[in-house]
């Protein structure tokens, strides 16, 4: 999931959607999913990286360059160890946010260690309970009765 504010709209190629005009206080949310024609998010062998091919990967990087914040669940970090940076197009790396209610993010994850962009882990566990590099910001959130975090907090993120 990516959030976008009007102040970070970069020069775009024609296939990148154009952001509607909005005030500086509003956000746009873009969801990006990689899946095959048969609806799978991984190949038969379990490979989940680059499933959409080179064009899809370039499009993903363009969306990241366009966004202020990119948000992923801890499952994506555990399975894919993503960098969540802009590499295939010109642009600035967005803030990276990991939703991790149970504190499962691996301390050796690339996005926690490369310092390429501001990184935030949202967890129900206290920062002192997580073994994360000092430059990573931990935001401790309460869980609801079903053990879930409210995603409304994402709307308050600023890069």
Say what each PLM segment does:
Residues 2-26, 30-37, 41-159:
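Active-site ligand-binding patch in enzyme domains
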């Amino acid at each position: 999931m990516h959030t976008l504010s009007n102040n970070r709209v970069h020069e775009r190629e024609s296939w990148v959607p154009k952001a509607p005009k909005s005030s500086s206080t509003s956000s746009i949310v873009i969801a990006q999913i990689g899946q095959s024609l048969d609806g799978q998010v991984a190949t038969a062998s379990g490979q989940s990286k680059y499933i959409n091919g080179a064009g899809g990967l370039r499009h993903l990087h363009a969306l990241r360059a366009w966004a202020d914040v990119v948000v992923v669940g801890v499952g994506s970090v555990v399975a894919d160890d993503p960098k969540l940076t802009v590499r295939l197009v010109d642009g600035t790396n967005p803030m990276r946010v990991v939703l991790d209610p149970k504190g499962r993010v691996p301390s050796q994850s690339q996005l926690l260690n490369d310092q390429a962009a501001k990184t935030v882990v949202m967890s129900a566990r206290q920062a002192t309970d997580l073994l994360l590099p000092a430059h990573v910001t931990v935001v401790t959130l309460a869980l609801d009765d079903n053990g879930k975090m409210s995603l409304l907090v994402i709307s308050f993120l600023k890069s």
